[in-house]
Every structure is written in C-alpha cells, then in structure tokens.
C-alpha cells in the first residue's frame, strides 16, 4: 500500500475511534486504536490519547466490577453463606481473566510498538507511566508470587517514567504530575508504604507550586486539577481516619474524568 493510502486508512481508524468514544463503545475503540498502534510509527498526541482513553474505560469497568464483587464476597463470607461465596468466586475469576487479558494486551503493545518508536521525552514518559499503571492493575487482584512480580514490573515502569520526566518535562507538566499521582497511589495501595506515598506526592506538589508561574495556558486546567488530586490524597493519607474510612476516596489520575468533561479533557 502506498504511503498516502496507509495515511488515509490511519485517518479512517482514528475517526472510527473518535466515533466509538462518543458512542461509549470502548471495546471497539480499543480494537481500532490497536491497529494504529501496530503500524510501527510514532503515534500523534491525539492517537496516543485515544488509545489511552479507550483502555482506561475498558479496564475501568472491569476494575469497578471486581471491587464490587470482592466487597459482596466478604459480606457473604462473614455471614457464612458458603454456596453464595462459591458462586461469587467463580464470577470474580471470570472478571479477573478479563482484567489479565486487557492488561497483557496493552502491555505487549507498549513494549513491542509504542516504546520502541517513541522519539519525544513526553511520549517516553507517557508509555512508561502506562506500563506502571497496567502492571499496578494486575497487582490489585493477583496474589502471592504473581502479585509480587506485577508489583515489581509496575515499580520498574514508574521508575523509568520518573527518570525520563525529571529530565524531559517541567514539574508543572500534566503528564509528569499524573505520573507522580499514580506512582504515589502505587506506594500507598500496592506497596503498603504511606510514608513513601506521601513523600512522593508532596514533592511533586511542592515542585509544581514553585514553578506555577511558568505554567502554559493550554495545560493550566489539567495541571491544577491533578495538583488538587495530589493534595486530596495527602490530606487523606495524613489524617487520622479510621482504618476502613479512606480507601474508596483515594484519587488516581482517572479521577480527573469525574471532575472535568471526559470528552474534551486532555488525557495523560
């Protein structure tokens, strides 16, 4: 196929992905953007964001289902309803299989197609952050050795992203702030290390505050919103809430979608 022909096909895929997003058909959005990602050329910012939004919604729905099922399972166990617990476990396993497949799917694309063709510092940070995120999602439901391995890979992804961000992106850049937000949640939830989580979140917040006057108009809304989420988590983590009081209120970067318009918010 000629270059112009393949460009036209790519434009068609991107348009179909946008259409799928508007129709909230995220599984189809992901399938379409996977075709673009496998072309083996660097994605544009728009293409990168479409791929990210599609996967965030596809994985987000299953993560929510898993949390609900786990909560119901605990309640049924406490009541001693063994037959119900057995049913829930089987259903939860189905969701876990879906979660694992989605994570492995995007992680393969990141390793084989996205990172090797990333030429900008921004893209490199973006993809390593995604790697950290999707291994973190695996660590949320895996157990024992598999959980340990997922957590180790998540840490490697976040560390690689952080190293690149520290030299390539200003402290106020929304992608760098989103990385700090999700990395701090990783320390809090997966590594059970609230001190590390608070230190990371506070450092990112303080560094961004110090450079706030350099913030560009185009990223002001995104950056200040993520800074607010960092501060919300710091407040939550450092307060004397009862042990069962705060988990559901922890903010990750996906929380932006609840506060800003999902259709036009810049995804990071």
UniProtKB/Swiss-Prot annotation:
GO CC annotation terms, alphabetical: cytoplasm; nucleus
Xref: Gene3D superfamilies: 14-3-3 domain (1.20.190.20)
Organism: Arabidopsis thaliana (Mouse-ear cress)
Keyword flag Ribonucleoprotein: no
UniProt modified residues of type Phosphothreonine: 214
Ranges of Basic and acidic residues composition bias in the record: 248-261
Keyword flag Lipoprotein: no
Name of the molecule in the record: 14-3-3-like protein GF14 iota
Upper taxonomic lineage: Eukaryota, Viridiplantae, Streptophyta, Embryophyta, Tracheophyta
